[in-house]
Amino acid sequence: MLLGASLVGALLFSKLVLKLPWTQVGFSLLLLYLGSGGWRFIRVFIKTVRRDIFGGMVLLKVKTKVRRYLQERKTVPLLFASMVQRHPDKTALIFEGTDTHWTFRQLDEYSSSVANFLQARGLASGNVVALFMENRNEFVGLWLGMAKLGVEAALINTNLRRDALRHCLDTSKARALIFGSEMASAICEIHASLEPTLSLFCSGSWEPSTVPVSTEHLDPLLEDAPKHLPSHPDKGFTDKLFYIYTSGTTGLPKAAIVVHSRYYRMASLVYYGFRMRPDDIVYDCLPLYHSAGNIVGIGQCLLHGMTVVIRKKFSASRFWDDCIKYNCTIVQYIGELCRYLLNQPPREAESRHKVRMALGNGLRQSIWTDFSSRFHIPQVAEFYGATECNCSLGNFDSRVGACGFNSRILSFVYPIRLVRVNEDTMELIRGPDGVCIPCQPGQPGQLVGRIIQQDPLRRFDGYLNQGANNKKIANDVFKKGDQAYLTGDVLVMDELGYLYFRDRTGDTFRWKGENVSTTEVEGTLSRLLHMADVAVYGVEVPGTEGRAGMAAVASPISNCDLESFAQTLKKELPLYARPIFLRFLPELHKTGTFKFQKTELRKEGFDPSVVKDPLFYLDARKGCYVALDQEAYTRIQAGEEKL
């Protein structure tokens, strides 16, 4: 900004005051520019101009369409109707579990029967119906049918039980609950504590003895319902579509609000940014109660006319066979799925598929190249985003390890920023003017996005709980008087504007005066331990500053040569990042999106009287890992053992 002002000032002075000819003015400005470090600007411009222009065009296209749909009061069901009209007999959804194919017309008719049935039962626009069901075609038809009536679906995580499940139902204020027959036992566990006015419907196989007494079998009721479209509700593009619950890794799940424009924006930025085509076939094995599976995946069917193959759950052994069977051209991934695939023994199917793109987020940089080269996937379409965030990113040119970019030349076009935070408390650091301090290239910081409620691409729809909203909004971030969304994620930007994920706030811990990135350490340890699941976290040790690193490894101790492992770590990780404690256990508990649940692991710590799994600690004198028994634990607690 200062350089630009200086150049403009020099231009005016040279031309208006000195009255120099344009050739001399231009030469003078060039000298001033290069003398001010402008050659870096030129280098960045040359290397990023094509990327930035393409990204800007994608942003402009989506923004233009969103504004048009706002004026026309479009909704997701209305946009889907245009797809049905365009190709009614094209396959829309395929459920791998039963090899069931639904055309766009069939999906349209099923969802209309849902809308008519709910309307006949007294539900109306603005009411909420909870949906608790594993992946299948009906899942999509049910929430889409609710949306046709203006009813808002609360999409419940199928891994939730008891208190967490009850919490989600209570906070949604649902008037009805539709659950899959496979979830009947979970509903029976909490049935006594549910509101007596809550209507219960079961979809799938019907066995009256396995469901609460008041439950009705939904499937025959839908067959009898009219299949014509009910009257369109008075809803627009910024009205609520459904609710998606956060994973709940740090507490009870929160209901994030998804409005129609957000659904469109998330699906379409991916569609245009990664150059998808209507004839692509998407393999979606991600849970449909989360945005990656339901918006990024299913959204390509509803909004752009693609065929989507739905799988109940991810299977590493069946992944490529499914892709071949259904001629998939795009596969979705999240979190650790790519590592699970790499961990499979080589097979013929992994080179006979037609997949041209892997679409998702969370692919570790350490296995990125191995994944794309082994499975012959030309394009890794990595993106960054959360259901509720207003600062999504896309790695449109497959930069290895990057989750997206922001223009260094025209950064104001997409108002996101990395801001400095306190390394211990993760609180925002502000300058003398009270405004957050932006990070320089190479400097880690929290990603924030400026909130502009009038702009559908910049608005923050938040959560049902206002208290949760307050924790995600900061004031005076870009300038005085503004507001910004706090992602809670630490990223770092390189000189060209590419952004790399570092850590989620709370996942970084400090040891020996240094910050330890759990994400980086987990990636290294997993690679060294034959792609085993590894969760890294900090534990408190009496008499020491910070937290000592501990790694929980989902692998038998017999699979690890501890002496060799310790020696290899010396080459792979700096001293402060090497885990002090190791815990070997049968499996690590994960969320539905494959995030490790570390809360209980932290609580249990390294106390052998609490943890019954094999424990080891890094003996500083011997330079290797030794068994951590009660005697060693006592010495560590007393400060007699040097760590």
From Swiss-Prot:
One of its GO terms (biological process) is long-chain fatty acid metabolic process. GO terms for cellular component: brush border membrane; endoplasmic reticulum; endoplasmic reticulum membrane; microvillus; plasma membrane. Most abundantly expressed in small intestine, brain, kidney, liver, skin and heart. In small intestine, expressed at high levels on the apical side of mature enterocytes. Highly expressed by the epithelial cells of the visceral endoderm and localized to the brush-border membrane of extraembryonic endodermal cells (at protein level). Expressed in the retinal pigment epithelium and in the retina (at protein level). Expressed in the retinal pigment epithelium and in the retina. InterPro entries: AMP-bd_C (IPR025110), AMP-bd_C_sf (IPR045851), AMP-binding_CS (IPR020845), AMP-dep_synth/lig_dom (IPR000873), ANL_N_sf (IPR042099), Lipocalin_CS (IPR022272). PROSITE patterns: AMP_BINDING. Belongs to the ATP-dependent AMP-binding enzyme family. This is Long-chain fatty acid transport protein 4. It comes from Mus musculus. The lineage of its organism: Eukaryota, Metazoa, Chordata, Craniata, Vertebrata. The gene is Slc27a4.
